[in-house]
């Protein structure tokens, strides 16, 4: 959302992991599974062994159990462990690029982009790279809301 002086001026809805949520852990996990099973990411055996899963189990967990978004988001740790692989670096950059183009493009180009959450923190290098290549200025990237609120009050306190 676009905020100024603590007030939300504009908000593009995320729409959840099925309809949107570009750049989220669920989308990274979904794209990872897609890339692995469609042969674009050559880490299938390692991925399945690391999670004790097979194709049928993944399909069952995604389509027949609740919280598929959390299940898919759990695979971001695998992405983080293998981020040195060009395929996974690009997977993350593509997700952030989609986020920027579908969400941030609706805000003023000169707005500083700050981010909150584990995905932004763990893939900060990729996020900053995408923001720069899309002509945007990166601000603070923090993992937890508490850290963000604390920094806000530290940097904006009146003395």
Where do the protein language model's features map onto the residues?
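ATP-binding/phosphotransfer module of carbohydrate and carboxylate kinases, centering on a glycine-rich
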Residues: 33-159
């Amino acid at each position: 959302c676009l905020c100024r002086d603590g007030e939300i001026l504009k908000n593009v809805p995320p729409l959840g992991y099925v309809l949107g949520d570009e750049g989220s852990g669920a989308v990274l996990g979904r794209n990872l599974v897609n890339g692995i099973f469609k042969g674009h990411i050559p880490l299938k055996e390692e991925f399945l062994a690391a999670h004790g899963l097979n194709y049928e189990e993944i399909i069952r967990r995604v389509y027949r159990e609740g919280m598929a978004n959390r299940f898919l988001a759990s695979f971001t740790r695998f992405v983080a462990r293998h981020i040195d692989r060009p395929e996974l670096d690009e997977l993350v950059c593509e997700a952030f690029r989609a986020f920027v183009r579908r969400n941030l493009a609706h805000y003023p180009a000169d707005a500083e982009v700050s981010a909150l959450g584990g995905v932004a923190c763990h893939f900060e290098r990729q996020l900053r790279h995408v923001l720069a290549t899309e002509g945007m200025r990166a601000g603070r990237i923090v993992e937890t809301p508490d850290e963000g609120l604390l920094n806000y009050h530290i940097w904006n306190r009146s003395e």
